């Protein structure tokens, strides 16, 4: 029911019934991504369009895909183009996202219940994704989670003991790690790391929620953060650099009353762009720095 996929390495139904897939950077796919699949969607790669001309295809047929324009520009020309829920910036968030699993352990795997974990084949890592629905569109942020697996991680599944089983191989494509294949178990130690729990869109900016209370005096400062935004080209070349990059002005940082969150107000938010956040200055109430200081939010719909 969808066209324009490039190299889907993972397909999974969400707990609420929607189907998502991961795709790998390459021709007509500017960066690796996570996307929802809806009937009639076009995901950007034109090589499979001819099959949509068969009588079994009951949706509109996309034709004349522009070569070299920015993804948000093509979306204006081709309404059927499905913008990703999450872009995975190249090398910052792996290179080859694959299988995925939602954490339905209700806290037995740690503080990220309900979030999505995605394996990466090249990086031998597991990434973390926090999705939200804004004006009927799924979008959200991705974060580093765990690196250093035996080799390329391609599948994951939660086991009956609420640990995450990760299946791996380096067959076909090289990746980090020196084993030809592997199966490893990732368990929560019971200690909660100081992390950005979620990054969500609010009018004029983003809300960060943390896994433990912050030092408000230190963290609620504009100098604690940096943000830039960029997007990608839709073209026949292999992948796309980050393009149309802009440093964004953070105008205010407002602490939530419970000291577990910050509202970051930003000038110049752009639809169809990754908003990359660096939170180097954030400190917990106990004086800890964030375990991972970067977050990458793919903004498609603005929050009302």
Protein language model regions, located:
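Intrinsically disordered, low-complexity Ser/Thr/Gly-rich stretches
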Residues: 220-256
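Acidic, Ser/Thr/Gly/Pro-rich low-complexity segments and short DxT(G/T)-type signature motifs
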Residues: 190-195, 215, 231-233, 240-242, ...
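Charge-rich, low-complexity amphipathic helices
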Residues: 56-60, 122, 205, 232, ...
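Intrinsically disordered, low-complexity segments enriched in small/polar residues
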Residues: 46, 66, 78, 134, ...
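Short structured motifs
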Residues: 194, 248-250, 262-264
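Extracytoplasmic/surface-exposed domains of secreted proteins
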Residues: 204-229, 256-292
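Hydrophobic/anchoring residues in structured secondary elements
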Residues: 3, 198-201, 227, 255, ...
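Beta-propeller domains with acidic blade repeats across secreted/periplasmic ectodomains
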Residues: 1-202, 216
